[in-house]
């Protein structure tokens, strides 16, 4: 028994005798009641309503921290009220009593309370909790109250079980478990979503009553969020770790479209139908639809058969009208499947008596003879024939003289080219003779060249007329031609000169006229009112790479250095006596083409213009792309931006079209177009095996802190212009390329990309914990056409004396390919080896015009076109030329051109602008059997000094 209980016992001894006397009296009364057969009650019996009745009994209580608690009792009628705690009487001095009178009953009401301290509860070591009870006395008996327990309140800090994050499909069940910390009294649990309380009474879909767990019966998209379990009692509140719940939507296929028409009009082709992963579209990391988005089946279209005539029948018997006839039928073969009917007459008739026939129903012998003889008739016919021929000769002579005089009167200077090699072929020199004595090619005030240009010259000028000289070749490919005499009128600046200007990031390169002639083109006026150069009223104003050049009838090539983008204007695409300032730009800002669904941008947005310019033959636009086209896992489209800013599909690369042509190479797409505008390539992955080609590179630079060194790892689309943007950014930041960039194949399998720094030298360098590996989500890499994707790592030296850094950087796709970049460098610029940004810097002028822009000499090109544009019974025509140059599809496009061979050669020029591989073209011609001499065997000495100065660099 505790010390306090003993004190209470000694203090109560003075009233115990009196209490015993009362009990003796009550016992006597009880004995008398027992003799009368009544049951002994718990309290001493008395008259009804005379025993003490508790109006207020002590309640269970909790001690918070060190604050004592008060236990109260109130009873009537009561002479005394005492507390008994743990079976021991509480000392009278610890009681506080108050007495009052109940006005309604006139009975005395006594109220007593005591304080229980934390120390008293802690010192008690009984089999049960610390408890206290009230005992009330009246003159007739006693009454006892309920036992009230007293406990020390607390709440542990750590949850026994924190809720865990979940990823569930839509309409799935979510169960978040929570076991609150141990506490007295037991903690109440409340759930928070995004720091807001959850009221399960207002949402029937949520249940929070099941053993502190949170149950969401059918997950909705709005149920995604951060959930927290909150536990609280009278002592404190505790928060669990937040659990992130993601409700995702797996993609579902839409219905199949109708089967497309057969892609060929004749023969074996294919039909396709497609569906999109939009029913529903994947959301919040949901799985992409499984299966193919495009289905293809073969189809066979009946080829149209044109009708052909049978042989003529025998002549019929001479009719009374002195005519006989013959017929033929269109049955060899007859037209079928929409083929053309035979052209020409199905029957012929002619006189069958050589003019001797009955006239007006009269016999021949009754016709009166004419006055002249048969010989006279023949002489009259000869006179008429010779008279007609003489008149024709005179008319031709007058026409030739008139044309010659007209051309001379409209020309400031001219040359007569006498080609003596046309019979034999080959590269020969030319004899020039001037029309006027003393005429030179120098610009003088008396001359008025056919050109008006609104800006100064910026680039080289070729001072010879490429059309004044023809190159011939000794080859059996070409048929001998008769002697020709060509008179060429030249426009001094349009045909002989070029105006170029390259602009990058808005910087203009000023230029002057060559040979010290610092004069603007605006001082030179044309003879007529129509200006030859049509200047642009506006150019693209977005963030872009841009280059411009002036092109005339000779055509040329416009190149964006180190971007893979180029524009080929064929010879003759621009009408004579006209020139255009043509520009080309690459959008480096936010792409205006927003991808739909699974479609991704595979190339830069390339703009060429002016948009209102018309060409007479298709030009070739080369656009780089980053798709791996070695396997058929892509559906690639060419798109064009409209004037309203929207994008519309021009064609699919695999489709047949007569409006444009797309030739897809491993790293670039060559497009033949008739109109200028903004174009881009997009791709829709057909399967998860579709691959994008990424270029990975690492740059490094010192940090502001002299001990830190920063590494930046880039993963960008494998297009030269994308990497050029990275190079430009790094140059501004002072970064240096530490290892040659490498190629990474990134699959469309929805798995993320990991970038890790490995093998850092210990005791020399260190990297912050948990930062050596970074992960990039799949969607960020797959659609990385917004800004260059990169991860930054910060390395710290232990001492300033460390100047060498070696490590490995691993770039890998989960369940995909990986690349290792080996970094071995010095952080001091004086000791670092410079790695060039590009394997071959393009230092050529952005614009080239005339023959220098083309790999195939113009004369050879003309003869190839003349040879292969002519149909051949053995099939050795332009179709064979296309086949030998790996052009096997959409041949109907070339069939619609006026010169299919010229368009094929334009495509060859676009594909071989870097290598100028004339050997491949020569081999193709040899295989066809039309030539036995390779074009690449043409040597420099065969060219005259005044010719086009082709060099080996131009492919010859």
Swiss-Prot record:
SUPFAM superfamilies: DEATH domain (SSF47986), Immunoglobulin (SSF48726), TSP-1 type 1 repeat (SSF82895). Residues 404-956 are cytoplasmic. InterPro entries: DEATH-like_dom_sf (IPR011029), Death_dom (IPR000488), Ig-like_dom (IPR007110), Ig-like_dom_sf (IPR036179), Ig-like_fold (IPR013783), Ig_I-set (IPR013098), Ig_sub (IPR003599), Ig_sub2 (IPR003598). Glycans are attached at residues 115, 226. Proteolytically cleaved by caspases during apoptosis. The cleavage does not take place when the receptor is associated with netrin ligand. Its cleavage by caspases is required to induce apoptosis. It comes from the Eukaryota. PROSITE patterns: IG_LIKE, TSP1, ZU5. Residues 862-939 form the Death domain. GO terms for biological process: apoptotic process; axon guidance; cell-cell adhesion via plasma-membrane adhesion molecules; pyramidal neuron differentiation; regulation of neuron migration. GO terms for molecular function: netrin receptor activity. Residues 1-30 form the signal peptide. Belongs to the unc-5 family. Interacts (via extracellular domain) with FLRT2 and FLRT3 (via extracellular domain); the interaction is direct. Has higher affinity for FLRT2. Identified in a complex with FLRT3 and ADGRL3; does not interact with ADGRL3 by itself. Receptor for the netrin NTN4 that promotes neuronal cell survival. Plays a role in cell-cell adhesion and cell guidance. Receptor for netrin involved in cell migration. Plays a role in axon guidance by mediating axon repulsion of neuronal growth cones in the developing nervous system upon ligand binding. May play a role in apoptosis in response to DNA damage. It also acts as a dependence receptor required for apoptosis induction when not associated with netrin ligand. Mediates cell-cell adhesion via its interaction with FLRT3 on an adjacent cell. This is Netrin receptor UNC5D. It comes from Rattus norvegicus (Rat). The gene is Unc5d.
